[in-house]
Amino acid sequence: MGLFDFFRGTNINDGIQQFRDTEGALLIDVRGDGEFRQGHIPGSANIPLQRLKDIKKYANKDTPLFLYCLSGARSGRAVNTLVGMGYKAVTNIGGIASYKGEIER
């Protein structure tokens, strides 16, 4: 996947590997707080879709961002929002519902 992946081009498991291989990248779960507490991918930060403006506390506009939600729909909307805010390296990796790895609670 390249920059500005508005639509999921790979599955979340491949996206997690790409995140791990990208120096300085952030993994962001855009689901709500309650969903995040029920289970999330280890190492991810929770910045719900409605609070995306808070991203500036964690990342500059060149930081590689890898976003996920439950199905990939909200993370797709989040990619559009962040690109509109000037972020340059934003990738929608899809939904945690398809994730095969460890879940942190």
Locate each region found by the language model:
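Rhodanese-like catalytic fold shared by cysteine-dependent sulfurtransferases
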Residues: G2-Q18, T22-L26, D33-P64, A73-R105
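Short, surface-exposed ligand- or partner-binding patches at beta-edge/loop junctions that are enriched
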Residues: Y68
